[in-house]
Amino acid sequence: MTIRNQRLSLLKQPISSTLNQHLIDYPTPSNLSYWWGFGSLAGICLVIQIVTGVFLAMHYTPHVDLAFNSVEHVMRDVEGGWLLRYMHANGASMFLIVVHLHIFRGLYHASYSSPREFVRCLGVVIFLLMIVTAFTGYVPPWGQMSFWGATVITSLASAIPVVGDTIVTWLWGGFSVDNATLNRFFSLHHLLPFILVGASLLHLAALHQYGSNNPLGVHSEMDQISFYPYFYVKDLVGWVAFAIFFSIWIFYAPNVLGHPDNYIPANPMPTPPHIVPEWYFLPIHAILRSIPDKSGGVAAIAPVFICLLALPFFKSMYVRSSSFRPIHQGIFWLLLADRLLLGWIGCQPVEAPFVTIGQIPPFVFFLFFAITPIPGRVGRGIPNSYTDETDQ
């Protein structure tokens, strides 16, 4: 058998042909911009988190008396341990930044619209899994903020009628955050990334069923090129830029995105003066505390994800991309500003005037999803595909 025939035979194997179909010969719109590179970048972030997490787990001890010291052991005694920890800790923030940009790009260009509803729903599930994974990963360092963050967040389940207290006891594995809680969170944090991998593969498969959206928001099977080598090279530019950005945080500001109280061993006796979650939880924290009643605040979190899930089913857009919808553009930038304001409010102390100001951004956030279908019905716009007009 010649070398050429051997290569062809290899590509015909089930696994190789699947990889070739989805990663090499996948037909891609030729006008994709750099904003479409955040999907592959998110995959790289996930791989970084899994690899660094596995190596960190080799040196970590999930016990309340040893957890904090084992983290310090990684930092001081393990060769390259400081790099592993800073890559993992800052990598979580980089992962969330990339995914946020990926989500907002989809909102701007309406990538969630028909026939890609299932792609969007899977994306929301992935986002929810990421939040749970990040929260379970915040507890294992067993610093002061880790302990009290776990105590406060898990206590929110007590707002659920009838079964709330039972759920809290089950989460804790006892009557307070202790060794059982630490072991449960560490185990879940080790498991969830692999579930994320499976959900991401389903997300990719669902996307490739109908193909990628593009900046124009129209579909054409004529103006497409293979993913390799064109978009590999284009994505490579984004990967290099991300590597530089990531390296700056690792080597020059590794602790900026963390909290100094987490360098104090967990102590259930003194309460920190201001319990602040990680930056990626701040918008949810702001929505939670915008309603004075505990049950109302917890109930306000669920609609955030329900709105994101329901958005693809608003059958109202003749024009998909916001490039041709100036009204929707304004609403989108208002949502982005509101998201930043939620993050700022979430890190402020619970006192005037922040409490009053904090009740406005959640209202604007939910208003966005309520009025999104309206601008989509203004104007006929461009056809859904280049061939629509010729087929009529």
UniProtKB/Swiss-Prot annotation:
How many cofactor units bind, and how?
Answer: Binds 2 heme b groups non-covalently.
Keyword Metal-binding part of the UniProt annotation: yes
Membrane-spanning residues: 38-58, 82-104, 119-139, 185-205, 231-251, 295-315, 327-347, 354-373
Q: Which gene encodes it?
A: MT-CYB
Q: Where in the cell is it found?
A: Mitochondrion inner membrane
Q: What is the protein name stated in its UniProt record?
A: Cytochrome b
Binding of heme b b562, residues: H88, H189
What is annotated about its quaternary structure and interactions?
A: The main subunits of complex b-c1 are: cytochrome b, cytochrome c1 and the Rieske protein.
Which annotated residues bind heme b b566?
A: H102, H203
**CC per GO annotation:** mitochondrial inner membrane; respiratory chain complex III
Q: Name one GO biological process term.
A: mitochondrial electron transport, ubiquinol to cytochrome c
Residues binding a ubiquinone are H208
